[in-house]
Regions:
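Enzymes that bind and transform nitrogen-containing heteroaromatic metabolites
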Residues: 1-204
Length: 204
């Protein structure tokens, strides 16, 4: 069975966005872009929530086709971004959207909700990892069903103070696989998940 692997950029206090969804704390460099490239190289399917998918579909396809980065470009080398864009452009993309209204992109499959059986069937298909980005509601639903196998957290050296936390329920079932510092001060923390939520684990 293949894995669902989550990649998330977070603050030291566990937020993926500050107040009003502000993201000024993000840091980026060639090392971090190389990580993002290796993350998608290990996958053949991408999994998104609607908002994150729409952000990706507006930013990356033009780069894959040779355009320059548009408004609010990521602080990473353009040629590395272009390589990443060309890698993800043809990949299968699964989007969870209750409305079904998503931006156009290649090879997109829309799910109206998280169905644990459907997700397990997807994981049983032959292939490489399923790389997951964004959407707190999708992330939390999958985590509650124990369907995220690995977490790759890019921990930034800053505190949001308040904002959107990665989790809003206790999960203590992660095991550290590796920790790697970047020159930017960001720490890449890779964890594997054991099965079950914290409550289920404590009930054993």
């Amino acid at each position: 069975m293949r894995k669902i692997v989550l990649s998330a950029w977070i603050t030291l206090d566990g937020c993926i966005a500050g107040p009003d969804d502000k993201m000024e704390w993000l840091r980026g460099d060639a090392q971090m872009m190389a990580y993002e490239q290796s993350f998608v190289d290990a996958a053949d399917t991408l999994l998104f929530g609607r908002k994150t998918f729409n952000d990706f579909s507006n930013y990356w396809p033009p780069l894959a086709n040779g355009a320059e980065p548009g408004a609010n470009p990521l602080p990473m080398p353009v040629e590395q971004q272009r390589q990443y864009a060309r890698t993800i452009d043809p990949m299968k993309k699964i989007v969870v959207s209750a409305s079904g209204k998503v931006e156009p992109w290649r090879n997109v499959c829309v799910l109206s909700t998280i169905d644990p059986i459907q997700i397990d069937d997807l994981k049983r298909e032959p292939g490489k990892n399923i790389a997951m980005y964004g959407s707190l509601s999708v992330l939390r639903a999958l985590a509650e069903h124990g369907q995220i196998d690995e977490y790759e957290l890019l921990v930034h050296p800053t505190f949001a103070g308040k904002g959107k936390p990665l989790f809003n329920a206790p999960f203590d079932t992660l095991e550290l696989k590796s920790a790697h510092p970047f020159r930017s001060g960001v720490m890449l923390m890779k964890y594997s998940a054991t099965k079950g939520t914290a409550d289920e684990k404590h009930a054993m």
